[in-house]
From Swiss-Prot:
The keyword rRNA processing does not apply. This is Putative antitoxin VapB4. Possibly the antitoxin component of a type II toxin-antitoxin (TA) system. Its cognate toxin is VapC4 (Potential). Keywords: Toxin-antitoxin system. Belongs to the UPF0330 family.
Amino acid sequence: MVKTITVSDDVYNELLRIKGKKSFSELLRELLREKKGNSVALKHIYGILNGEEYRETRKRLKELEKEFEKWKQFLTQV
């Protein structure tokens, strides 16, 4: 079954840029899997860290995400 969705031009252009040779369905499926994986990982560590450790871990993860995004942009420009 096929469904039609509407996205803004900037979102479409970003998806088009990162999809490469994949179909939009493949790209969206991959992005959803990544998002679900992050959620599962966070649920797994819930309760293991105290408040300060949790905040520090989240801060470091955000820093890493920014660096990975820069790396991804570099790789897609080459």
